[in-house]
């Protein structure tokens, strides 16, 4: 079972899991998030369902905040 680093915490991921299903299983909506996956910036517009997770992958989530 791959171990993923999610916001600096180690979590398990099912074998052959993709990034979108990983997030959905944790009830994480990507609409207003910026994702840093292995040092690369992604958004909900990227094809997250095609990114397969591997042991040691790193994912950091940042929420968009607006204001004035």
How would you name each of these model-derived features?
Residues 1-67:
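Ubiquitin-like/PB1-type beta-grasp interaction modules and other compact soluble beta-rich domains
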């Amino acid at each position: 079972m791959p171990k993923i680093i999610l916001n600096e915490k180690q979590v398990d991921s099912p074998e052959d899991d993709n990034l979108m299903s990983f997030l959905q299983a944790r009830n994480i909506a990507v609409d207003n998030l910026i994702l840093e996956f292995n040092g690369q910036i992604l958004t909900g517009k990227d094809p997250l369902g095609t990114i397969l997770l591997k042991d040691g992958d790193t994912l950091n989530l940042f929420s968009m905040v607006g204001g004035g």
